[in-house]
Amino acid sequence: MSKFKSLLLLFGTLILLSGCSNIEIFNAKGPVASSQKFLILYSIVFMLVICFVVLGMFAIFIYKYSYNKNAESGKMHHNAIIETIWFVIPIIIVAALAIPTVKTLYDYEKPPKSEKDPMVVYAVSAGYKWFFAYPDEHIETVNTLTIPKDRPVVFKLQAMDTMTSFWIPQLGGQKYAMTGMTMNWTLEASQTGTFRGRNSNFNGEGFSRQTFKVNAVSQKDYDKWVKEVKGKKTLDQDTFDKQLLPSTPNKALEFNGTHMAFVDPAADPEYIFYAYKRFNFELKDPNFTSEENMFKDVSEKPLIPARKAQITNANYKRHGMKLMILGNDEPYNNEFKKDESKNAKEMKKISKDAQDQDNDDHGGGH
């Protein structure tokens, strides 16, 4: 009995200790995360109420209708009222859970309401790192992100190698970043602070280290930070290509200029393989390669010249989509944004056509 009490005490202690952890999705710091928090709590409470009612009725029926010697065997007969109740109640339950869920999910696709114009950040995943290009400011960061408080941020998500998932739990849910396309995801920080971001989609041995730090600051501090970064080293193609290698250590870096001056990852998904070639990097299976041999042949300096911007995405050529290159001395203006928007519309059309074709192939509806 004492052993049972010890195990019970240990189990109870573990439950209490779990309450000391910082559950980030319940510590919302933005409007999108707040709506997600409400939806999660609403669903949990709603389902707990259902469980308590069902278990309570179960206990009552067991007690009231338990078998005894004087019990008369039950008689089955039709009861329209009861049958209507147990048919209608599940429909109400499903509707009560589905309506707010669907509404919230569709709301996520719309930018949070704000009096301030949204800013744009290109978030690119590659080499188990995150690259953040600020086209308006012409600066770029690696594994660190700084944004102003109370201003929507439109993240244009791209991947240069494996598919990843961009996630800042305290600001909102995750969204996938895929090769050969650009996905938009709008988030906003309603408070200043430092938050954690990560790739939430398992994509290989470096998955655990593909994280980044998010600094939400006042607009004044943000402007000051931008000015400081503009005074740092300009990002050149050799430096960027070296950072694309999984063998390059994950560090928080800041640069003047962006990779948008020499590559459009969505239009040129083959770019990263040329970067590998420049530094003699070869992907190896970590299960069959010793740690010291994983990256031993990688060159410190590029062995061949950098490649010019080009289109290797067949969809771009087929649909007349433009290569989006923004020089460090070129403005991120309406003309550039118009081409961005056109590419995005074509990409949505391609995605819809692919879904329709898949439905036709599998006998599904539209």
Swiss-Prot record:
One of its GO terms (biological process) is ATP synthesis coupled electron transport. A lipid is attached at C20 (S-diacylglycerol cysteine). Coiled coil: none annotated. It is a multi-pass membrane protein. The chain crosses the membrane at residues 38-58, 80-100. It catalyses: 2 a quinol + O2 = 2 a quinone + 2 H2O. Residues 1-19 form the signal peptide. It is found in: Cell membrane. GO terms for molecular function: copper ion binding; cytochrome bo3 ubiquinol oxidase activity; cytochrome-c oxidase activity; oxidoreductase activity, acting on diphenols and related substances as donors, oxygen as acceptor. Its EC number is 1.10.3.-. GO terms for cellular component: plasma membrane. Residues 335-366 have a biased composition (Basic and acidic residues). Residues 330-366 are annotated as: Disordered. It comes from the Bacteria. A lipid is attached at C20 (N-palmitoyl cysteine). Catalyzes quinol oxidation with the concomitant reduction of oxygen to water. Subunit II transfers the electrons from a quinol to the binuclear center of the catalytic subunit I. Belongs to the cytochrome c oxidase subunit 2 family. This is Probable quinol oxidase subunit 2.
